[in-house]
A protein has these predicted regions:
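Acidic, glycine/polar-enriched metal-coordinating patches/loops
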Residues: 1-72
Length: 72
């Protein structure tokens, strides 16, 4: 896997980037009370989009954020 810069959205339905955080694969970051997990870009990358894993109330929801990742 790669390290990437991941821009987190304002909220789950909003793909606009308001911050960029250096993020390693399979590690968590907490943003506005929501935990996000990086996946392997080689398997999750689709048309310059990346899937982040959101953990909320014991269920996982896949969210597609467009144009928010960059190779380091």
């Amino acid at each position: 896997g790669k390290n990437v810069l991941v821009g987190l959205p304002r909220n789950p339905q909003d793909g606009r980037v308001i911050t960029v955080i250096p993020k390693a694969e399979n590690t968590w970051v907490n943003f506005n009370g929501v935990n996000y997990m990086r996946y392997n870009s080689s398997t999750r990358e689709v048309n310059n989009s990346i899937y982040l894993k959101r953990y909320e109330t014991r269920k996982y929801v896949y969210e597609k954020m467009s144009n928010v990742w960059f190779e380091i």
